[in-house]
Curated annotation (Swiss-Prot):
Matches recorded under InterPro entries: KDSR-like, NAD(P)-bd_dom_sf, SDR_fam
GO biological process, alphabetically ordered: 3-keto-sphinganine metabolic process; sphingolipid biosynthetic process
Transmembrane stretches, start-end: 278-298
Organism per entry: Kluyveromyces lactis (strain ATCC 8585 / CBS 2359 / DSM 70799 / NBRC 1267 / NRRL Y-1140 / WM37) (Yeast)
GO cellular component terms listed in the entry, alphabetical order: endoplasmic reticulum membrane
Ranges spanned by the short sequence motif GXSXG, renumbered to the chain: 15-19
Gene Ontology MF terms: 3-dehydrosphinganine reductase activity; NADPH binding
Protein name as it appears in the record: 3-ketodihydrosphingosine reductase TSC10
CDD domains listed in its UniProt record: KDSR-like_SDR_c (cd08939)
Gene of this entry: TSC10
Residues where NADPH binds: 15, 17, 19, 47, 51, 86
Residues bound to NADP(+): 12, 20, 86, 174, 178, 207
Pfam families in the record: adh_short (PF00106)
Main location: endoplasmic reticulum
Length: 313
């Protein structure tokens, strides 16, 4: 079990201008034990410079751009650094790390929070939305992971989704890429066993992205999902940090996510560190024999009814 320390770290967060990424940044720059108790350096990354500046204002700490930090003579006072970078471009990620090395800011933890979903039926998606799903949800993570490992970053944190365990209608632009993240994590754990590699599967949490998703989400998708009571981004973040401190590296943030993960073990998934692993493996086997087949028949019937109602309109 590899330890987890929230202090004295250099932490890079992609997708740090909003949502869960911003919440992590806010947590990691706080002086919980009095002024000066926190010695973290936090770098938030996003494509939009203006969003990063606004995020710094919401976090409540004076942020400094990475370009300015490189030439800053009073670096010890700086906790929060921001940098505009399109992490879907490998060259731009590599260039960012050159600046980090020059600034003596090689990360000890990298949080790959960038991502987003546009829930629609497959044929309703535009070519741009399809490509955006690939670049935002996979390319951003694979580029950042590749460059991070080249610089011997000791802890990588990937962010997948509960739909990686159970992809269903309406998530064609999102779920396949989040499943790809899970596959990538399994391979990297084999190739880089000395590196701590965490994969988080968050449930719904309140964010700008969550509100936008509900605008385009098909009715059948909402029906299968059922009613949702999203937690705050801070609650989701604290659950993840608590799990990390326990040494867990396959992390869900609610009971539904844990049950879905229990039902989807399979090859390369038995050496992972998850909550109540042995019990989840047994429970998952029982659910796959009993409950899952019945539930999938119900889903099939829901989709059939939805299609029939749609055709009669």
């Amino acid at each position: 079990m590899k330890g987890f320390n929230c202090n004295g770290q250099v932490i890079l967060i992609s997708g740090g201008s909003q949502g869960l990424g911003e919440s992590f940044a806010k947590r990691f720059v706080q002086d919980d034990d009095g002024p000066g108790s926190n010695t973290n350096k936090v770098i938030i990354v996003s494509r939009s410079q203006s969003k990063l500046v606004k995020a710094c204002e919401r976090i409540g700490v004076d942020g400094v751009s990475l370009d300015r930090y490189v030439n800053d003579t009073n670096r010890n006072e700086t906790k929060l650094i921001y940098h505009s970078c399109d992490t879907s471009s490998y060259d731009k990620v590599a260039l960012m790390f050159k600046l980090l090395v020059k600034s003596e800011l090689v990360p000890s933890q990298v949080y790959m929070c960038a991502g987003g979903s546009i829930p629609k039926l497959f044929l309703d998606l535009t070519p741009e939305e399809l490509q955006n799903g690939i670049t935002t949800n996979y390319s951003t993570a694979v580029n950042l992971a590749h460059v991070s490992l080249k610089h011997d970053v000791p802890h990588l944190l990937f962010f997948s989704s509960e739909v990686a365990f159970f992809p269903f209608i309406g998530y064609a632009q999102y779920a396949p890429l989040k499943q790809s993240i899970r596959s990538l994590v399994a391979i990297l754990r084999q190739e880089h066993s000395s590196t701590r590699i965490t994969c988080v599967y968050p449930g719904n949490f309140q964010s700008e992205g969550f509100d936008l998703e509900n605008i385009t989400k098909p009715a059948i998708t909402k029906e299968i999902e059922g009613p949702s009571n999203p937690v705050t981004a801070a609650q989701c973040r604290d659950k993840i940090i608590s799990s990390l401190k326990w040494g867990l590296d396959d992390i869900t943030t609610d009971s539904i996510g844990w049950l879905l993960m229990a039902c989807d073990q399979g090859l390369n998934k038995h050496s992972t560190s998850q909550f109540m692993f042995v019990f989840s493996w047994i429970l998952g086997a029982l659910l796959n024999i009993t409950i899952v087949p019945i539930y999938m028949l119900i889903c099939k019937f829901q989709i059939y009814q939805w299609k029939r109602n749609k055709d009669t309109k």
